[in-house]
Amino acid sequence: MRPDHRMGPPHDEEPHMPETIDAVPEIDDLRREIDELDATIIAAIQRRTEVSKTIGKARMASGGTRLVHSREMKVIERYIDALGPEGKDLAMLLLRLGRGRLGY
């Protein structure tokens, strides 16, 4: 066995690349779509956070609590129903963005 085989193909050989040249433009298009979706999602999260903070301030100004546990549980349930178990983590993050961490 030649020593250079331990480190990969000999230096005069190109590593084998699968034929994916035709897929590159499609991948680029899909990545652009993901970037656009991310921008839309970020804008929606920012707006959701603003609305949630406004609701919290209004509730506290009228003598209520900053949050309503039953409402938060419905939000978490909605995300779990739509996205599966991972939806819980996303819902909790969105709730925290809108009201801040509990106990802090």
Curated annotation (Swiss-Prot):
It comes from Mycolicibacterium smegmatis (strain ATCC 700084 / mc(2)155) (Mycobacterium smegmatis). The formation of the complex with AroG activates the chorismate mutase activity. InterPro entries: Chorismate_II_sf, Chorismate_mutase-related, Chorismate_mutase_highGC-bac, CM_dom_sf, CM_II_prokaryot. SMART domains: CM_2. It comes from the Bacteria. Pathway: Metabolic intermediate biosynthesis; prephenate biosynthesis; prephenate from chorismate: step 1/1. One of its GO terms (molecular function) is chorismate mutase activity. This is Intracellular chorismate mutase. Chorismate binds at residues 59, 68, 72. The record marks 59 as: Important for catalysis.
